[in-house]
Amino acid sequence: GSGSEQVGWRPGLVFQNNVGNSHSPNVIALPLTSSIKKTSQPTHVFVKASDAGLKKDSMVLCENPQRMSKDNVGKYLGKLSDTCMRKVAEANLLASGAISYLDVVSLVTAWTKAVELNAVTSA
């Protein structure tokens, strides 16, 4: 069969480290859909509408990251809980397959770098 891509304007989850967010003209976003299907798929994360400023319950499609210009980003809707973001992070690692190439030491090294890249600094 043929592949599928999300089209049109839709909510998305900016899923990029803070350094990238502040220095790049682009963002990496994960699309959301209100079509709740394949809930057992490990790359899908359910988001309750009331927990995220959304109109409808939605699913984060972690297997379909999109790079987009910040000029194409719409309004801010809300922030996901740390618990939900952990689920998204895990689903994203599974979607990319990158985790299968890392041993425990490499995972800790990557985690340490991620903490540095996501540190919030005052300007």
Show the residue positions of the predicted features.
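C-terminal terminal-subdomain/extension
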Residues: 49-114, 123
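Compact nucleic-acid interaction/catalytic patches
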Residues: 2-9, 13-50
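Cationic, low-complexity basic patches in intrinsically disordered or flexible, solvent-exposed regions
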Residues: 117
